[in-house]
Amino acid sequence: MKMKKFLAMALACVMTLSLVACGGSPASSGTASGSQASSGTATGEPTTLQVYTWWDITKFEHLQKMQADFEAANPDIKLEFVTIPSDYANTMITKLAGGEIPDVMMLAMDQVPRYALNDMLLPLDDLASQEYMDALYPVVKDALTVNGTMYAAARDVTPKVMYLNTKMFADAGIEIPSDDWTMEEFTEIAQQLTTGSGADAQWGYYWANYMDQTYSMIAAFDGKIYSEDGKSSVLSTDENTKQAVQFMYDLYNTYKVCPSDQQAKQYGENEFAAFMANKVAMQIGALSTASTFDANGTEYTVLPMPSVDGVSRCSSFVNTWVIPKEAENPELSWRVVEFLSGKEGQQIALDMNYGLPASTMVDTTDFEAKTPYNKYFVEALETAIPFPTNLNGSEFQTMFQKECESLWAGVLTPEEFEQRVDEQAAEILTKEA
């Protein structure tokens, strides 16, 4: 009997030692987290943190440099970039709800309220220093906060400017206008540069039917999309917005200086394909647009947005870095975010022409000296109007873009378009989180 007890105890000890040797633990199961942050902490090996983005790091050199520089400065952390190539915002909500939790993730500013109000993001107020906050450009701060709480850190800023195809201008014998040009001059030039038909057709201006492209022109007229409380849209009541809508309608239907989406896409799916094919003379873009044109060998220059009533206004979009609320090691995640959104990371993005800095701590001297027009990007940081965000912005934008198709095609009048948008917005924008 004693021998049986001894053998049982010996067997139990062997099983326990085997479990420990294999790294087993009764508490080791039950997490669906996508993070690897716990690895390496006990062994002295670097901890691996996962960073989810819609960019493929193998195709973006500035991301590769950010990763290399961060890991060199933080040898205890390794970064693994994970690409979500399509339908990013909705896909990430599904992943977070299912327990797949990255350590850091990229997020567009218009999605920050949606995520924050659904309790998916970690507040950053206790992690970001006052120095960090004080150095942000004014256009950036609104993009990072929801109801007074900071939920995001800026990846970069994209103030909009007007790109001009200098080859098309030269071929037509038209001089590049001065940087204080007006919307009236812009319209006249667009008409002059719209010629031909069929295979020989070319157009003065084009913008893809995306919300940020359309809003750039609304912002130029100092217009608005949402009411102050965000519960309705103001297209039929805000006079500046109505003026902008009428102007865009006229570009398509009165002056006929814009190709349809179908006409533009015959040159490629990229929204700037017609510009790069020397078929569109002017188009709104951001700093990263220059990299696209440079890679294609496109001849171009840049001007500020044409002025309306003596003032040049541009819109600006902010892409951000956020930390999911359930991230395993928030302090480590913040070290990544602080680098990517801080002086070091944003200097890399600026130097490699992928985005304007969100922080005044970044030195723009060399960037401005590169070209005569780079100063326009930097000047826009002080005056740009933030892209409007809303809890129900995604659904609103889908509806808005669908209605825009009918407006540009001349199926709807501006008044009918404004009324239809406002009526549908009354239902969409009053939905709770």
Q: Residues of each region from the PLM?
A:
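Hinge/lid segment of periplasmic solute-binding proteins
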Residues: 109-161, 184, 301-303, 365-375, ...
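Short, solvent-exposed loop/beta-turn-alpha elements that line the ligand-binding surface or hinge
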Residues: 123-136, 178-179, 196-198, 203-204, ...
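Extracytoplasmic/periplasmic solute-binding protein
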Residues: 151-155, 160, 170, 185-234, ...
